[in-house]
């Protein structure tokens, strides 16, 4: 007791010297108060929070804990407030520096709960969790270090489900539904991710896949039909012999003109593995057939063939032309010419019937020799499937004319030689009688 009194006297002497007063009268009231209640003013074990308080055991890299009096969220109920459950540190509920306790609970448990509070708010435990994730036994250091920053929370959430061979990236990330195996080396962490090139980076796409649908140009407004354009057809339009550029291809596909229309079309073609360089020049002359897609061109050829078959006036043309050659001396020679022409037309149509040019989704096996087949293919690529059927329809109309011309020639021959018919009938009757005998 005397030792404490002497200490207080020394403190008072220091204060008097600092204030410039050396009389002892000022110390007497304080000595009485110290003797009565020596621990009422400021006990040495109490840690009242103030602005100069800094925990001495924090390492330099981490920020010190801010005083509780400066907490703007002190009125909010803190789920990590001090209670008997926090007597031991809880590793599964680490406290962050922004989550502070209220001033009232801190004052009530200042002497007893401050060490546990500091251990719960220690940011080293939070950083240690990230270090375990990046350098844990699963070898995730290289993988998570190379992943994008927005995918890091998803990877952290999936760590409890991670197996040693690899992890599965969730659907919310950029890489969709692809197993990702992260290696242990930083150099090949990204290269070890298998990615579906058909969906992300382009590549070989099914040629029969529909690229887009194009409305017809030749149909009426009351019966507008759309034609499906496949990837193979787009590839044919970009290849020889047409070699369309972005502007012409956009017109064929009926794409609206825009400022970046060519760029968007090239990007869409890159996704299906087709390259359309900028500034490309067309290789063939532009015709009305250039604006047609294959479906509409074939439809046009079929309708043209139907009209030629049903509406072409073959009989009237044959009768008109035969009247110009009514001389009996020319009829035999003309008939032979008609028969020879009909045979030539038949050979020509038979050749076109064996054409196996690629059209639409068909990939027929070639029948003709490569030399003649390549020429027919070139013609069909220029006309987009309209050429060969249209030529066959025209030649069929010519054959119908030849047939009607031969019939008219026979009628003219019989009308000019009426006795020949009776002579032929008599000869045939004589042969039948001999055969009966």
Curated annotation (Swiss-Prot):
Transmembrane segments: none
H-S-H (helix-span-helix), dimerization, as annotated region: 280-410
GO BP terms, alphabetized: anterior neuropore closure; basement membrane organization; bone morphogenesis; cell population proliferation; cellular response to iron ion; cornea development in camera-type eye; embryonic body morphogenesis; embryonic camera-type eye morphogenesis
Superkingdom of source: Eukaryota
UniProt modified residues of type Phosphoserine: 239
Span list, region Disordered: 14-107, 414-437
Biased composition (Basic and acidic residues): 428-437
Compositional bias (Polar residues): 414-427
Modification(s) after translation: Sumoylated on Lys-10; which inhibits transcriptional activity.
Cross-link (Glycyl lysine isopeptide (Lys-Gly) (interchain with G-Cter in SUMO2)): 10, 177, 184
Subcellular localization, as worded in the UniProt entry: Nucleus
Site of covalent link Glycyl lysine isopeptide (Lys-Gly) (interchain with G-Cter in SUMO): 10
Main location: nucleus
Keywords from the named record: Activator, DNA-binding, Isopeptide bond, Nucleus, Phosphoprotein, Transcription, Transcription regulation, Ubl conjugation
Record Pfam families: TF_AP-2
GO cellular component, one term: nucleus
Misc note: The antidepressants, citalopram, imipramin and lithium-chloride decrease the DNA-binding activity.
Domain topic, free-text comment: The PPxY motif mediates interaction with WWOX.
Similarity field: Belongs to the AP-2 family.
Subunit details: Binds DNA as a dimer. Can form homodimers or heterodimers with other AP-2 family members. Interacts with WWOX. Interacts with CITED4. Interacts with UBE2I. Interacts with RALBP1 in a complex also containing EPN1 and NUMB during interphase and mitosis. Interacts with KCTD1; this interaction represses transcription activation. Interacts (via C-terminus) with CITED2 (via C-terminus); the interaction stimulates TFAP2A-transcriptional activation. Interacts (via N-terminus) with EP300 (via N-terminus); the interaction requires CITED2.
The protein's name in its UniProt record: Transcription factor AP-2-alpha
Name of the coding gene: Tfap2a
């Amino acid at each position: 007791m005397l030792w404490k009194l002497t200490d207080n006297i020394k403190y008072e002497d220091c204060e008097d010297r600092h204030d410039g007063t050396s009389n002892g009268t000022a110390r007497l009231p304080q000595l009485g108060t110290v003797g009565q209640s020596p621990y009422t003013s400021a006990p040495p074990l109490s840690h009242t929070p103030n602005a100069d308080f800094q925990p001495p055991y924090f390492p330099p890299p981490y920020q010190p804990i801010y005083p509780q009096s400066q907490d703007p969220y002190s009125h909010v109920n803190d789920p990590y407030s001090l209670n008997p459950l926090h007597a031991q540190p809880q590793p599964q509920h680490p406290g962050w520096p922004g989550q502070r306790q209220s001033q009232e609970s801190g004052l009530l448990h200042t002497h007893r709960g401050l060490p546990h509070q500091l251990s719960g708010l220690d940011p080293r435990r939070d950083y240690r969790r990230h270090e375990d994730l990046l350098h844990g036994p699963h070898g995730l250091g290289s993988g998570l270090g190379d992943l994008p920053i927005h995918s890091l929370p998803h990877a952290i959430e999936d760590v409890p489900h991670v197996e040693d061979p690899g992890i599965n990236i969730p659907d919310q990330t950029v890489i969709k539904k692809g197993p990702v195996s992260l290696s242990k080396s930083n150099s090949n962490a990204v290269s070890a991710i298998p990615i579906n090139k058909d969906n992300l980076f382009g590549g070989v796409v099914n040629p029969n896949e529909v690229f887009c649908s194009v409305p017809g140009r030749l149909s009426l407004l009351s019966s507008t039909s759309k034609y499906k354009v496949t990837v193979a057809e787009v590839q044919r339009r970009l290849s020889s012999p047409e070699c369309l550029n972005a502007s012409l291809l956009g017109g064929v596909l009926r794409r609206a003109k825009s400022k970046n229309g060519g760029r968007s079309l090239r990007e869409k073609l890159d996704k299906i593995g087709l390259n359309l360089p900028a500034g490309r020049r067309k290789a063939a002359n532009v015709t009305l057939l250039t604006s047609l897609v294959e479906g509409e061109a074939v439809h046009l050829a079929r309708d043209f063939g139907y009209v030629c078959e049903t509406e072409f006036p073959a009989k009237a043309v044959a009768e008109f032309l035969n009247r110009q050659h009514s001389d009996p001396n020319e009829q035999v020679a003309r008939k032979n010419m008609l028969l020879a022409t009909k045979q030539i037309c038949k050979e020509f149509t038979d050749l076109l019937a064996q054409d196996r040019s690629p059209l639409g989704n068909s990939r027929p096996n070639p029948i003709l020799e490569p030399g003649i087949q390549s020429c027919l293919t070139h013609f069909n690529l220029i006309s987009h499937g309209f050429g060969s059927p249209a030529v066959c329809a025209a030649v069929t109309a010519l054959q119908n004319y030849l047939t009607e011309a031969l019939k008219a020639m026979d009628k003219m021959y019989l009308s000019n030689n009426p006795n020949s018919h009776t002579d032929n009938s008599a000869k045939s009757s004589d042969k039948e009688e001999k055969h009966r005998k």
